[in-house]
Amino acid sequence: MVFNKKTIEDVDVKGKRVLVRCDFNVPLQEGKITDENRLIGSLPTIKYLMENNAKVILCSHLGKPKGEVKPEMSLLPVAKRLSELLKKEVVFAADDNVVGENAKAAVKNMKDGDVILLQNTRYRIEETKNQDNFSKELASLGEIFVNDAFGTAHRAHCSTVGVTKFLPTAVCGYLIQKELEFLGNAIENPSRPFTAILGGVKVSDKINVINNLLEKVDTLIIGGGMSYTFARAQGYTIGTSVVEEDKIEYAKEMIDKAKEKGIKLLLPIDRVVTDKFDESAEPILEDDKNIKDGYMGMDIGPKTAKVYADAIKDSKTIIWNGPMGVFEFKNFAKGTFAVAKAMAESGAITIIGGGDSAAAINQLGFGDKMTHISTGGGASLEFLGGEELPGISALNNK
């Protein structure tokens, strides 16, 4: 995909009310933000608008309140932290109906360069149904719409798509621009050898991604829970490991397709297994492609990790989506760590496709060694699968 959308730099924002859809869906513990990467990611767009004398109206969802007012999902902590990060008060419009008296009064009193944040858009049941009445209310606050929430770009909601019906000037912010340029270039014009690493539990979540990437990559590496479905497709025993019976045939087809296209498809040759899914479970090395009855695979083994690391070191572009094992359990994080370390040392263009891989990379301390960590789990998956993202399609073309 070639990046052809208008950005905030293509429109005159001076003195204008600009409604910005951000992704402030951050983890909260007792009202404290435990990971503020998404807030940091939104700052360049917000600062640009402030410096160019726009009146900045921010909106986002947080969690899944499903149309109910849930105080623990209020965006108040986000407003407080943003005020600190921007060194300027971000006025919080605390309306349970999102566009209420507080929001309207705050917008009315805005001066150029001011910033307000609306309440959680998913407090409204209409938001996820993309219903016109709520889209219209949101749009009534602004004159220009900016979407900078890559994490929800694959959702057609009021605050991502619906508002563009009523605010014809709709452009993207810096974060979406950066995401599309990195992911788009990696897929359409990669420096080669180009390697994709796929992990996580389900093959079914990644079917489009595998199909699309097999048209583009030189090497495809598979780990995580989904690798057991591939192991079954190769005729190996997998004990009590997770498997998608209805995807074994598909895995066989993909193994054949890779062979046909001359693509290196790397699958595990040894495993770390255990007899119960538990953090305290003892890791046992299974130095074989077969897993014994009563045992389940929890991570790739050291031989596999070495083969994968060598392939990574030979690459010029690497995209990674999904961990190699149950990295949340210390005993089963070595495979994910080995892949992360190899990527950090590769000197290649390294792109992490959001979600669990982003969490793993940051947790293991390799975040600053990656070229780009995507802010969108589902969105980056759909994009890598070659699908249109409604939140992007709705924006003005250049």
UniProtKB/Swiss-Prot annotation:
Superkingdom of the organism of origin: Bacteria
EC number: 2.7.2.3
Pathway: Carbohydrate degradation; glycolysis; pyruvate from D-glyceraldehyde 3-phosphate: step 2/5
A Pfam family recorded for this sequence: PGK
Main EC class the enzyme belongs to: transferase
InterPro entries reported for this sequence: Phosphoglycerate_kinase, Phosphoglycerate_kinase_CS, Phosphoglycerate_kinase_N, Phosphoglycerate_kinase_sf
GO CC annotation terms, alphabetical: cytosol
Swiss-Prot/TrEMBL keywords: ATP-binding, Cytoplasm, Glycolysis, Kinase, Nucleotide-binding, Transferase
Predominant cellular place of this UniProt entry's protein: cytoplasm
Alphabetical GO biological process terms: gluconeogenesis; glycolytic process
Catalyzed reactions per annotation: (2R)-3-phosphoglycerate + ATP = (2R)-3-phospho-glyceroyl phosphate + ADP
Residues at which substrate binds: D23, F24, N25, R38, H61, L62, G63, K64, R122, R155
Localization in the cell: Cytoplasm
Amino-acid positions noted as binding ATP in the UniProt annotation, renumbered to this chain: K206, G297, E328, G354, G355, D356, S357
A single MF term (Gene Ontology): ATP binding
Subunit relationships: Monomer.
Family, per entry: Belongs to the phosphoglycerate kinase family.
Name of the molecule in the record: Phosphoglycerate kinase
Taxonomy of the source species: Bacteria, Bacillati, Bacillota, Clostridia, Eubacteriales
